[in-house]
C-alpha cells in the first residue's frame, strides 16, 4: 500500500486523486466536529464552501437543519453552532442534518471530489480509520486541511499517528518522504498536544479560550466511527 500526504487544501491536485482512497484530516476542528456529530446520530453532514450556500440549503430544505461552522475560528453570524465538537451532542444532532462551512476542512473535502473513496479522520477516530483503510486495501492519499492554505503541525502529526495505527495492522506500507516524516515526528512525539502547543492554529484557539475544544480534539480513539463523504454529503461509513 502506497501512502502520500498533501499538506493543505490549497495543495490538492485533483487529477492525482482519481481512483484513490483519500483521508481528510482537520483535527482543529472540522473533522473532529464531523466525526462527533455522526457518532452522536446525526443523519448526515453537508460540507459547503460558503456561508450563502449553507443558508440557501437551510432555507430550501424540508429536513431538520442545523447550521454549523466558523470563519477565523469564530461562530458565523446566524448559525446555530460554531466549529466546536462539544456543541454537537446527541441531544441536538440526533436525526438531523448538519450543514457545515469552515475555513479549511470543508474546503479540503469539496476539493477532493475526484477521489474514489473519501473518509473523514481525526485523532478521535484514527484506529477506526486505519481498520477501514486496511479493508479497502488501496493506495492512500492523506490530505491535511492545513490553516489558510499553509502547512499545519496538528494535521501533520495526526497523519503520522494514522500511519502508525496502520503499521500496527499491516507492514506492507510504502511511504513517500513526507509520509515518512509525519510518521517519524509522531513516533518521537507521542504526547501530541505537548508537541503542537507552539503551533499557530493551536495558539489561535487557545487565545479564544477554547481549551476544552483542544483537550477534546487531542484525545486518541474515543470514537469507533468513520464518516464517509459521497454524493455531496457525509454519513457513517459501512466499510
From Swiss-Prot:
It catalyses: (2R)-O-phospho-3-sulfolactate + H2O = (2R)-3-sulfolactate + phosphate. The keyword Hydrolase applies. Keywords: Hydrolase, Magnesium. Signal peptide: none annotated. Transmembrane segments: none annotated. Its cofactor is Mg(2+). Disulfide bonds: none annotated. This is Probable 2-phosphosulfolactate phosphatase. It comes from Clostridium botulinum (strain Kyoto / Type A2).
